[in-house]
């Protein structure tokens, strides 16, 4: 491992030990803001410091074993210790490099998940409902909270559009690579000839930004309409105009929220989604102007980019970005999507490592 990386790790370890002492200080404990900030930083450093401590211990094991190589009775055991430690060091160094990669500051945020039916008519709406259930079950397995913000149901079941907020630890970092075009190939229930149809939905994942990071939005740039909430399946229909539709005139972005009975709450939620969409649109514009490793992985960053195909007759799911195919479609649609999500994250980290190696 390079001296510069070791120096960086030693610096992080010093800070970790400093924070450990601070968290035991009475003056810090009595200051909630300081204690919360130090606790968060301490938690963020914990994994990398433990990993570095293991690396240090393994190197120490090798040094001690090398001394025993001159002892005929201990030579074989010492040689084994050296080989095992060197093999583990390789794994630990790889882990350390990943832990030191620049973090996306948005990764720890909650997120907004939007699913829209695309080509395919009623079948696309049904597939949008299938994707919504898939993500909801995945969120449930992670103990995340899913909050419905807006739903436009389609006539044959499913949704023309559904927007939810997902709350939990590291939500955006786990789901951000789900943005893009999702395609389904199957025989619709209404198909009498048994022909396979292809339909599509687009998924967009955006971080929920804290107030300090929200863009300034000029009220004069907004058109706000109110209307009566349709309710879920005709139930609990509001008799007041509590649903809110906000149009950002300069960008043409439209956000609707009808989940709450209070117009004020719906407006606040819609404004939060609007802010995230404006930031996302700007980021996509910048990504279109430059080619980098994230753009290579996510395609052009356009939500219509086809990223995944769900083929029902073959029981397979294919992620086209990394040419990954798995034959457990039923499990995937029931929310077991870690084996699709984790390889993409790993590939992204590998791209980052490769880029850093080129820079160095």
Swiss-Prot record:
Post-translational modification: Methylated by PrmC. Methylation increases the termination efficiency of RF1.
Matches recorded under Pfam families: PCRF, RF-1
GO molecular function: translation release factor activity, codon specific
Region (Disordered): 285-309
Compartments reported by the entry: Cytoplasm
Biased composition, class Basic and acidic residues, residue ranges: 285-295
UniProt keywords, alphabetically: Cytoplasm, Methylation, Protein biosynthesis
Modified residues (N5-methylglutamine): 235
GO cellular component entries: cytoplasm
UniProt function note: Peptide chain release factor 1 directs the termination of translation in response to the peptide chain termination codons UAG and UAA.
Protein family (similarity comment): Belongs to the prokaryotic/mitochondrial release factor family.
Name of the molecule in the record: Peptide chain release factor 1
Species, as recorded: Haemophilus influenzae (strain ATCC 51907 / DSM 11121 / KW20 / Rd)
